[in-house]
Amino acid sequence: WYERFARLFQHEFERPKPIILYADHPDFQQTNTLSGQLSEGTGGVTESLKNRVIMPLTGSYGATDHVLGHELVHAFQYNIAQGRAGAGLQGLMMLPLWLVEGMAEYLSVGRDDPLTAMWLRDAIRREDLPTIKQMTTETRFFPYRFGEALWAFVGGKYGDEQIVDLYRRSLRVGWEPAIEQVLGTTSDSLSAEWREAVEAEYLPLMAGRQAPGESGALLLAPSTGAGHQNVSPSVSPDGRWVAFLSEKDLFQVKVNF
């Protein structure tokens, strides 16, 4: 990862950056290298000041490799921001998450990602693909997936080198002027081009498909007496019951029927 990113970013670290690995996620959550608590959904962390990468082994070589690549992108982002070419960490902290996290996802999973493709298909089906400005201002749009998809489009059309140039420029002038200066287009025009490309890719797949509500009845949801998180469903042999794990009780996850 380091050699690949060093070539792409045209940037080398002046000194090695520590990578702190934990045997599993529970050990990672108990790290004393960070203040505060880490949630189960946190896959890894890169410190902004020391640029240390802190992460667990996931039990899957592929997943661990992805998290390591993702966090090393952040290490490069921080290091560039702190150098002469950047504007300090303040410039980085002003950038939207779709730009920072989306770049880390794109450069660590590549242009064709099945998970991101699933998000895009669903957004097209619901006619809810965000614009760049919506991703910047509305938290309901997950920046990792939609940001990765946008960067994949930019990388495919303009080249990955332009992604790096856009990031560097964004540190100094902000993301919107950087799009105009580096790509020669506006954020609105880029949003329209991205939407057109996504629709061309996924709209043909929507033919003959039904929305979930048209295909069956919703069984496990707050509206039916279940919780917000309901996992591991198992149907009884006679089809009358569904056993599942749910957090609908206040203090614990229990088996429900």
Language model features with spans:
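Juxtacatalytic substrate-recognition/specificity segment
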Residues: 1-96, 113-115, 133-135, 175
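Surface-exposed helix-capping loop/turn segments at secondary-structure junctions
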Residues: 7-15, 156, 160-162, 219-221
